[in-house]
Amino acid sequence: MEGIIVLDKPQDFTSFDAVAIVRGLTRERRIGHTGTLDPMATGVLPLLLGRATKAVSLLPETAKTYEASFRFGEAYTTGDVTGEVIKTDETPVLRAALETALDSFRGDILQVPPMYSAVSVNGQRLYKLARQGIEVEREARPVHIAELTLLEYNENEKTGKLHVTCSKGTYIRTLIEDIAQKCGTVGAMTALRRTAACGFTLADAVLLDTLKAMKENGESFDEILRPVEKLFSMLTAVSVTPAQAQRYLNGGALTISRCRAPKIAMPEGTQVALYEDGEKFLGLARAENGEFKYVKSFSEK
């Protein structure tokens, strides 16, 4: 089996749990995912099967989109309501003040990763230290918030929901805590749903229960498998001849001027997706010294 199953991960399952369950259902041993979702989070989790697992280390940097629910007035050890309350605050937050605060978090910002995260400091995972009650200094990291919209807000309950499109490595829990601080209070994430990642949306996703039902009914999973090239749809597509395709699959370089590449600037290091006759996906190549150099193929020779 080869391709991508876009899972709508259920709450209270780790990403590893999801991989293990799908491995059991599909009998495909080679399965990986494109980015961890916390157990409390739900939503888009692309799972790579078979040869598609080779794409994990090659994924382009793409934004991810979330809907995040929050509540002001309580701070938690974990930054979300799965932890223990460590501080309360009754400061009111008006919608107008919240909207103004959000302006400070759009675009390029610096964010300190939370203690309850998989980030390593001096070779130790932060979450392991946090579980021992140890807090260490962490360096702020640059992240990009492309979209930040207040979808809902109840001033009396101090609860609401945000739409967030952000770069890889952004912690939504921390974003909410920082927004609360900007509003002069404390806050925490109460729910998180990833609505888009790696070019996929919830419209592409299937539930675990659906996969289980398909297995029980003897249905093929082929109809829900997405092609691996979907992961690279944001790259420039280059068409090559069958002879060039064979040279590429053997590890050879291709002269850019002899390929049917779009007439656009191709800076050194640009990664492209190669297709035989514009249809069959071959793999990835990199522009270097007037040639497309082999990076990784996803096609049999």
Region annotations inferred by a language model:
Residues V136, G169, G290-K293:
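A short local loop/turn or secondary-structure capping micro-motif enriched for an aromatic residue
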Residues M1-S167, T174-V206:
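Catalytic cores of RNA-modifying enzymes
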Residues K168-G169, Y248:
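Glycine-rich beta-strand-to-loop/alpha-helix junction loops that act as flexible
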Residues M1-D12, F16-H33, L37, A41-T42, ...:
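Accessory RNA 3′-end/elbow-binding domains used by RNA modification enzymes
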